[in-house]
């Protein structure tokens, strides 16, 4: 961990930041922004923009990228940091940047200060690192977009975390005070303490365990689940008070996997206390026992809470039913409890009215469509597997039904003879036959010239038999003709020459290619006028 090099900010002029903002605006719909577009957005002459971009490239605030078709400039993460710090300095929110105090798969954390030298915490979101690139699976920043740049996703993550910080702070949760946000930078209060994973001793482990479990339940009652509630995202102060950090993965309790995330948070706390403090409690919260008290997930549009679900929930709230957010099983249980109580008969009627609504009002249309597609795919795979098993069973039954005796009775059928155990190569068969004949003659002499007819027949069959296999193993490989090899080598040389010819050289390579194309067009239509 080190310091962020912000010394160049004091030497940058207004035109430098003007060009940086122009590149940022051009990257909304361009992967690389051409020089002409940067000049048009910045409102500066192309020559002045080119000189300014050269200065910015020297300090790695922008990067020039060349390709086969397009050349242009791209904003780097350092340039994005400078733009965020410049805006916050102009608002008089940030006055200095200090050492780095934390690093993660999604962000970097630095110590900072305001113009009055009060300590602040600066969190720079860094989405797109190689250690965490499955953003579309793990986070909902994309929503329905097919693609987006890492800088834009970092900006969305910062805005989402700032919104969660403000909402949790207003409801009395122990979180750092949110100060301001700009692009991918979140400014918050600096919390002086140590993470729970580094704590070695507490006065009362049971009381701390109860406070953490109560905090999980309190968040669930307000409609959200932390999703990553572990010892690395909890800071303990000197008086053993707990402060929560890191909220980009918070989900709604109406998320399809809400119970899994809730149980995972509870399991993380129980496992940590058993391992660290040798404390294990028999009581822990259950997801089915949570009763909603607020709708913070609706206000913040947490993951898993769709607009249609929000409309249905608001409609139920207007009718006076505060249990419409629960799942179907929880509704059935509460209906039974309400049915037993005669005084709550009106509430049970309202619950039945809500249950009679169609399912498409309770679930998102996209989720239902996805479920139908998965069911169809499973049916297709199942039909293919059953078809194969049926064919295999029919084939085995047919093989078992074959009558070998009937085949033997047919003409042309001969017994299949296996090679003997001491079978050798055909090249050595003549020598072996001579040795066998000598041995057989000796045996005949020993037996006084009396040889059985069966032995003579076996001897004739052995000599006439053709070996059905060989002991040696030969490897086979595909061979190429000389003409084929020459043709392939010539093709490789041609491709290498084309690669060298297409190699981009110089900053104005795209301009040169366009001019060459224009010359060809002019030469083609020469003399027409």
UniProtKB/Swiss-Prot annotation:
EC number per UniProt: 2.7.11.1
Keyword set includes Iron: no
Gene Ontology molecular functions: ATP binding; metal ion binding; protein kinase activity; protein serine kinase activity; protein serine/threonine kinase activity
Residue numbers binding ATP: 123
Biased composition (Acidic residues): 337-346, 429-447
Gene3D superfamilies to which the protein is assigned, alphabetical: Phosphorylase Kinase, domain 1, Transferase(Phosphotransferase) domain 1, Winged helix-like DNA-binding domain superfamily/Winged helix DNA-binding domain
SUPFAM superfamilies, per database record: Protein kinase-like (PK-like), Winged helix' DNA-binding domain
InterPro entries xref list: Kinase-like_dom_sf (IPR011009), Rio2 (IPR030484), RIO2_wHTH_N (IPR015285), RIO_dom (IPR018934), RIO_kinase (IPR000687), RIO_kinase_CS (IPR018935), WH-like_DNA-bd_sf (IPR036388), WH_DNA-bd_sf (IPR036390)
Any single GO CC term annotated in Swiss-Prot or TrEMBL for this entry: cytosol
Tissue: Expressed in pharynx (metacorpus and posterior bulbus). Expression is restricted to adult stage.
Active-site feature positions: 228 (proton acceptor)
PROSITE patterns: RIO1
Domain of life: Eukaryota
Keywords: ATP-binding, Kinase, Magnesium, Metal-binding, Nucleotide-binding, Serine/threonine-protein kinase, Transferase
Function text: Required for larval development.
Annotated protein name in UniProt: Serine/threonine-protein kinase RIO2
Source species: Caenorhabditis elegans
Lineage, opening ranks: Eukaryota, Metazoa, Ecdysozoa, Nematoda, Chromadorea
Gene giving rise to this polypeptide: riok-2
